[in-house]
Regions:
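Catalytic cores of peptidoglycan-degrading enzymes
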Residues: 1-78
Length: 78
């Protein structure tokens, strides 16, 4: 994958979030995670030009949407 180390989380409502280019992974397949839990360390693995987080939101497991309004709908302001 172009993301290098990456994590995919399936949320209880069916939404999938994807986190890419991670330097370290602190969870493994099948782990149940909680809000605020550290899941990885940011990095620059894969096709990347510098350390950053690649973040995607796929409501109901469908196509990716712009995460900013999706987060805002849930009370999270960037």
């Amino acid at each position: 994958s172009g993301f290098g180390n990456w994590i995919r989380i399936k949320h209880d409502d069916g939404t999938i979030t994807v986190y890419g280019h991670m330097a370290t992974l602190d969870v493994k397949v099948g782990d149940r995670v909680t809000s605020g839990q550290k899941i990885a360390g940011m990095g620059s693995l894969g096709f990347s030009t510098g350390s950053h987080l690649h973040f995607e939101v796929h409501p109901n497991g469908g196509d990716a949407v712009d995460p900013k309004p999706w987060l805002a709908e849930r009370g999270i302001q960037l």
